[in-house]
Amino acid sequence: MSFSDRLTRAADIARRAHNHQTRKGSDVPYLSHLFAVAALVMESGGSEDQVCAALLHDVLEDAGVGWSGEIRAELGEHVLALVVACTDGLPDAEGHKESWRTRKHRYIEHCLQDTPLAREALVICAADKLHNLRSLLIDLREHGPAALLKFVKDEPELRDKGEATLWYYETLLSIFERRGVSTARLLRPAVDALREIVRDLP
């Protein structure tokens, strides 16, 4: 499969939107995550629209809805719709987001929708969750359970954070497997590894 210059334009929007952002709790440029997710979508046979949306899947959530006009103008309505479908909650006018659990329940509801757009978006969502969980597992192995402290802000206890994180990934894995998303086969061993870690939390 060959790609048009739309992919270059998507990458440039991602660069400008996320250029000064880093991965949570680290100095790793946020762009690394976006390119990793796009690569996973390519490897699973994703379309050009899906790869472009993978590069942009966090733009509205992390850089603001003001980018939607440029995404639409440069890449089309369908790519924007995919980005919206992959978005995990938008901040309000003051920049505040809903609670972690509220956002995750809503995200799961979106993943359960059985529409052509939702099925396309699942390919991107699965790639996103796979890369996020792989990164979390690396952090857990390098830094121990304390790596969970930067997640699930509305759960005060470490074990509760771990169990909430495991619930989220297990629920999504079940959806991806039922819908036949190919990346689920890679996500399953990562979820199994997380389950072992959570089981041993104090």
What spans do the regions from the language model cover?
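Active-site helical microenvironments for divalent-metal-assisted chemistry
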Residues: 1-202
